[in-house]
Amino acid sequence: FTSYHNVCYFSGFLYCQFGRRYGAVLSKDGVTTISAAIDGGQPWRRSTGDNVTYTDWRRDSYFTALKDLLKGVKRLGIEFDHVNLDLKVLLEDHFPNVELVDCAAAAMDLRTIKSAEEHVLIRKGAEMCRVGGRAVMEAVKAGVPEHEVAIASTNAMVRAIADSFPFVELMDSWTWFQSG
C-alpha cells in the first residue's frame, strides 16, 4: 500500500511524505512499513508490524527495500487510485515480471468493517471535533481575525487529543476556518 489511509489502517503508522516514498507491505505473515530515515524511528514505534527504513543517499533505495520484502513475488497489489503514473512506471521497471493488480476496492471494503475499538476511536475523534467547534463558537466575535479563531480551535483540540491519547505523537493538527 502507498496511500496514507491504507498504510495507517493496516499498520497504525500515519506518514507525512515530505517528498519521500512510504508504503506498507501486507503479507500472510503480517505487515511491514517502508519509511524514509527522516522520522526518528516513528514508523517502527507506531506500527503494529515490522519496519524497514531506507536512506535516500541513493535514488532508488525505496525500491531496493521493496525488492528485499517482495522476493519471488509474481503478483503485486497496488492502489490504482493512489499510484500516479510515475510510480507505476517505476514499479514496472523494478518489478519487470510481476503482474500489478488493483487492490484499492478490496482494501476499501476491508476498511468499511469496523471493530468495537474503531467505533470508540471514531466517537473520540468526533468529540475532538466538537471541542474544536465549540472553541470556534466561543472565539468568533466582531473584529477577531480568522487566524485567532483557528488558533483557539486548534489549541483546544490539541489539548483534548493530548489528554485523551497521551501515548500518541501529535502531528499536523490545525483548524480550517473561514468567516464571512
Regions found by a protein language model. Name each.
Residues K71, P96, K124-R134, E138-P145, ...:
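Generic secondary-structure signature for well-ordered alpha-helical cores
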Residues F1-G132:
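A composition/biophysics-driven feature that prefers long, compositionally simple stretches
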Residues V7-Q17, A104-A107, I113, E146-G180:
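Short catalytic-site patches enriched in acidic/histidine residues
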